[in-house]
Amino acid sequence: MADSGCWRPPRDCDDYWSEWKHCKSLRNRFHNYYTYGKAPECQEWKRDYMTCRDWEKTKSNNLKEALQQSEKTRLEGKQNNSPVWTLRKNPPPDWYLPLDPGKPRQ
């Protein structure tokens, strides 16, 4: 049975490696350049992979905190992205009426 008090990284170390390989792939680099106008920053994935591997060897608290901080920063970055448009709470009041081709769109 696994020890419940033993800390594990939020991801398996191989997941960090896979993310880094995906980030460096030609297809992903092209997609990021097309979408954002620049190549993706992939070094954080490799740094996290190396930190995770080092943590597996030494079980150092500094490495543990570095991995936790990296994941926290990554999650905060995802949550700060705002949607393209505001979500509405209710449908428009006249949603059920047939469309009028002569009516100008808003």
Swiss-Prot record:
UniProt-recorded name of the protein: Synaptic plasticity regulator PANTS
Swiss-Prot/TrEMBL keywords: Secreted, Synapse
Region (Disordered), start-end ranges: 67-106
PTM info: Rapidly degraded by proteolysis following neuronal stimulation, resulting in increased AMPA receptor clustering.
Source organism, top-level taxon: Eukaryota
Protein family according to the UniProt entry: Belongs to the UPF0545 family.
Coiled-coil region list: none
Function: Negatively regulates long-term potentiation and modulates adult synaptic plasticity.
One GO-annotated biological process of the protein: negative regulation of long-term synaptic potentiation
Lineage summary: Eukaryota, Metazoa, Chordata, Craniata, Vertebrata
Family annotation (Pfam families): PANTS-like (PF11326)
Keyword Secreted in record: yes
GO cellular component, one term: synapse
Subcellular location: Synapse; Synaptic cleft
Family annotation (PANTHER family): UPF0545 PROTEIN C22ORF39
